[in-house]
Amino acid sequence: MTRASQQDVRRRAGWLPADQEGLEAWLRGRRERIADRDPDRVLHPAVAAFRDLVDGDPVLRMHANEMVAQVPSGREYQERHVESFDELLVLIDEVVTTAPEYSEDQMVMTPLDGVLDWTKATPAGFAFYRDPRVNDALRGVLDAWSHFLSSGKSLAVLTDAPSGWRSDAARRAVGMDQFLHDPDDEHWGFASWNDFFTRHFRDGERPVASADDTAVIVSPCEATPYRIASRVHRRDEFWAKAEPYSVEELLAGDESVDAFVDGTVWQAFLSALDYHRWHSPVAGRIVRAWVQPGTYFSEADAQGSDAAEPTLSQGYLAHVATRAVFVIDADDPAIGLVAVVFIGMSDVSSCVIGEGLGAGARVGKGDELGYFQFGGSTVCVLFGPGVVESFSLEAVPQAPDEEPTPLHVRAHLATARRSEEQPG
């Protein structure tokens, strides 16, 4: 997929409205909501801590005010949706105590990304969101939002109202009949928004492809293929416009890096309405599994007019965003080590590794590994050189003007060379 032909993947995946007009309509609604807000209402402690950090540092305060005043690159806004950093703080504060609502044309599943969209794609914003102190403060904001989304209060959006997830339109869009739920319960039996968002498939919905054939590797996520890259380098300029993969940064310097140099990376993006749990692409033993802290709203500023599109930065974000990394030693010696990287983007950066899935744990092909909370984003699978004989047709990235078609989780991703076919 070339940079010149890419569309906004995040819009294609349903995290943001399909067009700019839809996003601006949603933003107008948020501004109308805060216009009715009690002026004496105090900010959430996490948002107040973010404010205090910026107010207490002259450089951060300068960047914060400049990124609101500057015009974003790659966006054609019809109007400003924020006039000051103080107003931006109030918009953030509203997000922390609300769950995403359903909409056929204005749905924003990543609301913090929506309200920060203007500021992220400005020169001052590039510097602001890469500052480690800002990142730490935003982690506190995201933790507060995650706490709300894991509470019973977040069930207010699981209703039959037009903007509710139990509405007929939402049920069809989600394909709810294929997921475990209690149709007779007012909230389908879910305890919170996060519980709903990390819902399980019914038994039999996603069988493991060629379960007894160790050469068949399966998809770790329900995700639309984005890119296949071969002969990847140990270190490369991942921030450049072409966004090459840099194995050392992608795996955060793990000792397994050498096994993947000159190998292959397959990347895919998750849809907002689909399944957000992860599964093992192979049977084997987990060598290491960890969550690598990273940035939350950083964008690659080498992309010119594409700079404001977060998922046009997918390759870049794979190296710098919060991500869960698994290194698995496959039972099939022809495969060897496989690395799977589950990457959070923007406000969907919560990566949860399954209980007991640390070093030494055994996993079967297709077994669950963990999940994204309050969203998900993209996944990379790394193979050593000469391991993959072919990718399945469904795993090959589509033309950007085609309707996104996800590769089912646990479906055939690739076929490894048989042992006797290994080069060397």
Predicted regions, residues:
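Contiguous, well-folded functional domains in the mature portion of proteins
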Residues: M1-G424
